[in-house]
C-alpha cells in the first residue's frame, strides 16, 4: 500500500509541480523504469488518483481472454477465474477513482457471459428449454431460440438479457465488478 501511495504522490508531483523539500523521490533506478502511469484529478472531495488507460485495457484483455467462446470449460470454473482476476485488479487499484469505467466493464462482462451460455446451449431445443427454465413465456422462448447463431445480438437485444439477469449470474457465483469496487473502496 505504501508503494502505491508513493507512486501516486510521485504522479501528482509530476503533473502539478508540487515538489516537497528535500529529495523525497531519490531512487537508485532510473525514474522512467519505475514510473507508474496514472492521473490525478481534483474534485469536490479532494485529489483522486485513477489507473492509467493501459492498465484498464490490460484488465479488459484479461477478462476477454477468460470469456473466449472457443474455450470450452465449465461455466463455474470460468466464473471462478474471472472472480480471481477481478478481485486482484480491484484490490490493487482500489484507492483509484474509476466507478464509471468499472460499471461499463461490468455490463460488458455480463454480456460476454450471456453469449457463452447461449453458445453452450447449442441447439434450438436446448435454448428453448433454458429460457423456459428461466421463466420466459413459451412463445417468446420458441421465437428467440430459433434466431440462429447471432450470439451478440441475442445476448443484448432479446429476452436473454432479461432472463439471464445480474441476479441470476450472481447466484451462479459471478461477482459484480462495480459492486465489489464500491464495497472495497468504501465509497
Q: What are the residue ranges of the model-derived segments?
A:
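Non-catalytic terminal/accessory segments
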Residues: 1-187
Amino acid at each position: 500500500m505504501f508503494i502505491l501511495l508513493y507512486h501516486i504522490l510521485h504522479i501528482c508531483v509530476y503533473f502539478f509541480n508540487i515538489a516537497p523539500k528535500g529529495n523525497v523521490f531519490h531512487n537508485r533506478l532510473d525514474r522512467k523504469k519505475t514510473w507508474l502511469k496514472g492521473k490525478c484529478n481534483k474534485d469536490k472531495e479532494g485529489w483522486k488518483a485513477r489507473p492509467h488507460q493501459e492498465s484498464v485495457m490490460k484488465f479488459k484483455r484479461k477478462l476477454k481472454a477468460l470469456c473466449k467462446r472457443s474455450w470450452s470449460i465449465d461455466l463455474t470454473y470460468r466464473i471462478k477465474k474471472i472472480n480471481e482476476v477481478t478481485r486482484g485488479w480491484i484490490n490493487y487499484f482500489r484507492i483509484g477513482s474509476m466507478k464509471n469505467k468499472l460499471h461499463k466493464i461490468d455490463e460488458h462482462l455480463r454480456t460476454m457471459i450471456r453469449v457463452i451460455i447461449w453458445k453452450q446451449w447449442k441447439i434450438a431445443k436446448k435454448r428453448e428449454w433454458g429460457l423456459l427454465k428461466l421463466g420466459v413465456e413459451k412463445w417468446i422462448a420458441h421465437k428467440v431460440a430459433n434466431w440462429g447463431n447471432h450470439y451478440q445480438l441475442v445476448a443484448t437485444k432479446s429476452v436473454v438479457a432479461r432472463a439471464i439477469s445480474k441476479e441470476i449470474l450472481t447466484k451462479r457465483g459471478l461477482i459484480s465488478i462495480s459492486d465489489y469496487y464500491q464495497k472495497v473502496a468504501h465509497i
